[in-house]
A protein has these predicted regions:
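Glycoside hydrolase catalytic-domain context in secreted enzymes
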Residues: 1-178
């Protein structure tokens, strides 16, 4: 069984819409709590979809392609730390990507985020799921599958799969994701 938790983001500002769900403004503290939560749940037979990877800081307009900006140093030293600790120390086998864009790229279709950092650098072997369904048109599911990072499309209809299954590249990427 799975659990959509813990929320591993850091508090980026005092008015963020999900601060009640996230542990702290300190990446190390949030990471330690996330790793302990994930480790305990995994030991008891439950996998945790650590969420919302990454930089999920606002609820307002997040469904409309909110762009979140941070430089690579800040992302690696602060905002990625809770997720990295949950993967490396807690043994997480499931991640939920965030709604927002990081820069101009939707997090769920970011090869840099989901393949290069999560899978290649941290050694994550597991499932990445999108955060709910695409209701407002900014999530490009074909790009998410083709980017190679997203395995499960939360709440998506069959039209997306029909479109992807009609191309050789789409078929290959869906097989790799499975």
């Amino acid at each position: 069984s799975g659990w959509y938790a813990p929320g591993a983001n850091t508090h980026r500002n005092a008015f963020a819409g999900r601060n009640f769900e996230y542990y702290s403004e300190d990446g190390f503290l949030s990471g330690s709590m996330s790793a302990a939560t994930v480790g305990a749940a995994e030991k008891n037979g439950m996998y945790c979809y650590i969420k919302h990877f990454a930089l999920n800081e606002r609820e307002t307009w997040r469904h409309y392609g909110l762009c979140t900006w941070a430089d690579e140093q800040a992302m690696r030293e602060i905002y990625f730390v809770p997720f990295e600790k949950a993967v490396k120390e807690g043994g997480s086998t499931a991640v939920m990507s965030s709604y927002n864009n990081i820069g101009t790229t939707w997090a769920g279709a970011s090869t840099a985020l989901l393949t290069n950092v999560l899978r290649n650098e941290w050694g994550f072997i597991g499932t990445v799921i999108t955060d709910n369904n695409e209701e407002h048109g900014f999530m490009d599911i074909e790009k998410a599958v083709l980017a190679g990072g997203t395995n499960l499309l939360f709440g998506w209809g069959t039209k997306t799969f029909d479109n992807l299954s009609q191309t050789a590249t789409g078929q290959l990427k869906m097989r790799e994701a499975a």
